[in-house]
Amino acid sequence: MAARPAFGIVRQLLRSNARGCSSGAPVTQPRPGEPSRPTREGLSLRLQFLQEHAAPFSAFLTDSFGRQHSYLRISLTEKCNLRCQYCMPEEGVPLTPKADLLTTEEILTLARLFVKEGVDKIRLTGGEPLIRPDVVDIVARLHGLEGLRTIGLTTNGINLARLLPRLQQAGLNAVNISLDTLVPAKFEFIVRRKGFHKVMEGIHKAIELGYKPVKVNCVVMRGLNEDELLDFVALTEGLPLDVRFIEYMPFDGNKWNFKKMVSYKEMLDTIRQRWPGLEKLPEEDSSTAKAFKIPGFQGQISFITSMSEHFCGTCNRLRITADGNLKVCLFGNSEVSLRDHLRAGASEEELLRIIGAAVGRKKRQHAGMFNIAQMKNRPMILIGVLLMLQDSPPARWSNFSWDPLRVRNPSARQCLSDQMASLWKRHCIPKALPLSQQCLGSGSPQRHYSSYPDPDTHSKCLSTGSQAPDAPSGPGPTSNQLTHVDSAGRASMVDVGGKPETERVAVASAMVLLGPVAFKLVQQNQLKKGDALVVAQLAGVQAAKLTSQLIPLCHHVALSHVQVHLELDSTRHAVLIQASCRARGPTGVEMEALTSAAMAALTVYDMCKAVSRDIVVTEVKLISKTGGQRGDFHRA
């Protein structure tokens, strides 16, 4: 195995300095002011009493399926000191202005509120949380919150060895370290930075300080590090590690792609061939990991099966992004800005109502989307995990399937990198014009939807940065008579049997003028019927597929791709809709695109009509079409 020499060095390095501490909690010296052992025993009895006589869990943190959310993940920063290839472009990503990020006091205010309502575990994430200057102070102040039992941290390990002693003294009692390879050269290739030995020093320091287990997160990618599976497992023989193998989220385009993704069952089979005595360990109801142990080994391994076997039914997690948005589901499409309400002077009761409403809308699984395996890329580094960006476009865009929608945060932090904007420009549907040439910002939140792989979420990236190449405008050759009427004036379906099959693409648009009241409710996802934009996109996709049943003389077309894109325009209180369809065949797909856009617009109307009847559906029109005997068309 290629990784063996480096693996041996790694294991020797870790073993040579490990102290063999076996306590289940971090080993720390008593600090001044700490209670004596008898007092601690008294506290334990009190804790036992409180557990036996606990009040009902907070209704604000309990969703409609009875899940009690006692685990909060807080992103301390969007910044990272690595540039992992599967995470972000080498130049990084645009960041939120500092003024829009949560301050330390705001973080602690929200943490205090959640802990008061029943959260007993907080994990600090990023970006990379250890590059935040006041991270030790934050941990210390969180440690003072009554009722908070666990303070954890997920880190890339670069700064861990230097900061961990102070963090432990401040109250940090759980550490997860990300490491995808045991080969130094491969590490540098993956993260585009040096630092492998710093990460190993961090793992060693965590073991030395008595953290047990030290959790090591490894994203397994076919063709990159799956050959190191056994080496990672072997580390647990003499070290108190919990090596957690994470299924790679295969965002190579928009389809479920097994080429890079290594499933949990495949990994398990590989490991069992080497260690047939591998035993399954019991797990907590809310655990995301399937734990295993090899008899006689000091550590264990786990699998996080977010792709092949979801764990939504027992989810107890909530997330707060670095800019203060509450996410109730990692794969969900709605965020609520707690920062804005805090800064507007909301009371604790008002904040709890906002939080409770968001938790109450949480779906049964994966934000109500059919299956995570059918979903495409979504930005994640800004909610505490990695942003999956592909280095090259898929071979054929026509292979894309539609994607259930995502709500986008307005800030520039979610704008596409120049690299992805370039891919969008070169490989999007030919000649499709952007809906708007202007930024829709003006200080109000913007929600952005698309079924393309990680499309731009800030309107300026949809303008000059991703404009399609110039193309001839105006109609191409046209017929001088109606094609669906015979010589006697009767309706007649065109015979397309003799026409050649060519690639056909059409883009249509529509606009819904909502008015300020309905627009605000849609923008904040507060409609009683639910998320208007999500439902509208689904309706648009469905309508495209049913066009031949709605338009009497329209041929049935086997569509290879449908995209419905919705964007909020705060300057006009409008929803802008763009629908595109692609197929290969003897007839065009203009009607499919127009029907899709129109139905999406009508669905927005239906979702909002209880709020206002003064809603206008307008500008339903063809934007462009390519393929066919009459040539291409691009609206000027």
From Swiss-Prot:
Disruption phenotype: Death between days 1 and 11 after birth, due to a progressive neurological disorder caused by massive cell death. Death is caused by the absence of molybdenum cofactor, resulting in elevated sulfite and diminished sulfate levels throughout the organism. Mice do not possess any sulfite oxidase or xanthine dehydrogenase activity. No organ abnormalities are observed and the synaptic localization of inhibitory receptors appears normal. Long-term rescue results have been obtained in mice lacking Mocs1 thanks to an adeno-associated virus-mediated gene transfer. Pathway: Cofactor biosynthesis; molybdopterin biosynthesis. [4Fe-4S] cluster 2 binds at residues 312, 315, 329. Signal peptide: none annotated. The keyword Acetylation applies. Residues 19-40, 444-484 are annotated as: Disordered. GO terms for biological process: Mo-molybdopterin cofactor biosynthetic process; molybdopterin cofactor biosynthetic process. SUPFAM superfamilies: Molybdenum cofactor biosynthesis protein C, MoaC (SSF55040), Radical SAM enzymes (SSF102114). GTP binds at residues 73, 123, 154, 215, 317-319. The keyword Lipid biosynthesis does not apply. Its EC number is 4.1.99.22, 4.6.1.17. It comes from the Eukaryota. [4Fe-4S] cluster 1 binds at residues 80, 84, 87. PROSITE patterns: MOAA_NIFB_PQQE (PS01305), RADICAL_SAM (PS51918). Residues 1-383 are annotated as: Molybdenum cofactor biosynthesis protein A. Coiled coil: none annotated. Its cofactor is [4Fe-4S] cluster. It catalyses: GTP + AH2 + S-adenosyl-L-methionine = (8S)-3',8-cyclo-7,8-dihydroguanosine 5'-triphosphate + 5'-deoxyadenosine + L-methionine + A + H(+); (8S)-3',8-cyclo-7,8-dihydroguanosine 5'-triphosphate = cyclic pyranopterin phosphate + diphosphate. The active site is at 606 (for molybdenum cofactor biosynthesis protein c activity). Residues 64-279 form the Radical SAM core domain. Isoform Mocs1a and isoform Mocs1b probably form a heterooligomer. HAMAP family: MoaA_B, MoaC_B. In the C-terminal section; belongs to the MoaC family. In the N-terminal section; belongs to the radical SAM superfamily. MoaA family. This is Molybdenum cofactor biosynthesis protein 1.
